[in-house]
From Swiss-Prot:
Monomer. PANTHER family: PHOSPHOGLYCERATE KINASE, PHOSPHOGLYCERATE KINASE 1, CHLOROPLASTIC-RELATED. The gene is pgk. GO terms for molecular function: ADP binding; ATP binding; phosphoglycerate kinase activity. This is Phosphoglycerate kinase. Keywords: ATP-binding, Cytoplasm, Glycolysis, Kinase, Nucleotide-binding, Transferase.
Length: 396
């Protein structure tokens, strides 16, 4: 990795120093209880490393999309869970800046951990307000960005603070960038990219950037219907982006010219209306009627994709194969996850978001090389964009 990480620092750079760590503790809550603590667990290596080196660790994160101060989005449940995981009390403050915060930090001992309040309670955070960033930076001697999930945002706590104090990457940030970077730069082949989700428009950048790198694309999810319609198929009332049909044709032609496989589904699970208990049927894609709605890939497609998955040496997967929130339409996503898990000879990378959620639901996390903690950030990374939260860190 071209950026400095905490591993590049000498012990004296950390011992007794105040270190502001941007983490991504944006975890799902139900009635004030954390339903999935993965993001907290992913941050532990960085936090423990800094504690062991005698740093005073000041954690900052957002949670949800608050409108000003909101009691139900305070970080108290996170501090409680983090304390349990570290086996050490984590003091949670009721603010991010100000006298009380400064006083608490001045009382910290080496190896102590403090969690500041939800940074998005301040609108200055998302505006990347320089004065606000300066106040945050004044709390510490060093900045560590370990929040890959927000690295694509230029906010005060993800980018702004690094204008005032030296910034380096944490261990999770390092892992994310190195694993995905290696897959893009020197993949073992065959290298396939599996894309799903509702919209082609969300994945255009990824397709274009990976067009020169992969051996094949496997396309599922709602976006498949834009490609199928572009080829002249009747898709009934399935989701389609009418304004992206020309672009879909252009992408398919580009793949053809370069000899890159571009696999579209052969069949789909079809309903007349999208609801939990809707009667389903399976249809080949050339048999759709005017009132059919495609909601998942069908068994022939699953088998076709599975064959390609089992041959692959590098796999990047982003986006579900159907409307997987509804159990009856989740089979395609489940079977693709199982096929990737079955291939023990490949590097498998899942780009956060819905695909990651599906894998967790299936309990297959340990069968994948890497499940990214960032949905939007991993997409932008795969698009070849420089992430603002990484760009501001010191070069090696």
């Amino acid at each position: 990795m071209a950026k400095k990480t905490i591993l590049d620092l000498r012990d004296e750079d950390l011992k007794g120093k105040r270190v502001l760590v941007r983490v991504d503790f944006n975890v799902p809550l139900k009635n004030g209880v954390i339903t999935d603590d993965r993001r907290i667990r992913e941050a532990l290596p960085t936090i423990k490393y800094l504690m062991d080196k005698g740093a005073k660790v000041i954690l900052v994160s957002h949670l949800g999309r608050p409108k000003g101060f909101q009691d139900d989005l305070r970080l108290d449940p996170v501090a409680k869970r983090l304390s349990e995981l570290l086996g050490k009390p984590v003091k949670k403050l009721n603010d991010c800046i100000g006298e009380e915060v400064e006083r608490e930090i001045s009382n910290m001992k080496e190896g102590d951990v403090i969690l500041l309040e939800n940074i998005r309670f301040y609108k200055e955070e998302e505006a990347n307000d320089p004065e606000f960033a300066k106040k945050l930076a004044s709390l510490a001697d060093l900045y560590v960005n370990d929040a890959f999930g927000t690295a694509h945002r230029a906010h005060a706590s993800t980018a702004g603070v690094a204008q005032y104090i030296p910034g380096v990457a944490g261990l999770l940030m390092k892992k994310e960038i190195e694993i995905m970077g290696k897959a893009l730069e020197s993949p073992e082949r065959p290298f396939i990219c599996i894309l799903g989700g509702a919209k082609v428009s969300d994945k255009i950048g990824v397709i274009k950037n990976l067009m020169n790198k992969v051996d094949g694309f496997l396309i599922g999810g709602g976006m498949m219907f834009t490609f199928l319609k572009a080829l002249g198929y009747e898709i009934g009332k399935s989701i389609v982006e009418e304004d992206k049909l020309d672009l879909a044709r252009e992408i398919m032609n580009m793949a053809k010219e370069r000899g890159i496989q571009f696999l579209l589904p052969k069949d789909a699970v079809v309903v007349k209306e999208i609801k939990e208990d809707a009667p389903t049927s399976i249809k080949d894609i050339d048999k759709f009627e005017k009132d059919d709605i495609g909601v998942d890939i069908g068994p022939k497609t699953i088998e076709l994709f599975r064959e390609e998955i089992l041959k692959a040496k590098t796999i990047i997967w982003n986006g579900p194969m159907g409307i997987f929130e509804i159990p009856a339409f989740a089979n395609g996503t489940r079977k693709i996850a199982e096929a990737i898990a079955e291939n023990r000879n490949c590097v498998s990378i899942v780009g956060g978001g819905d695909s990651a959620a599906a894998i967790q639901t299936l309990g297959l996390e340990d069968k994948f090389t890497h499940i990214s903690t960032g949905g939007g950030a991993s997409l932008e990374f795969l698009e070849g964009k420089e992430l603002p939260g990484v760009a501001v860190l010191q070069d090696k």
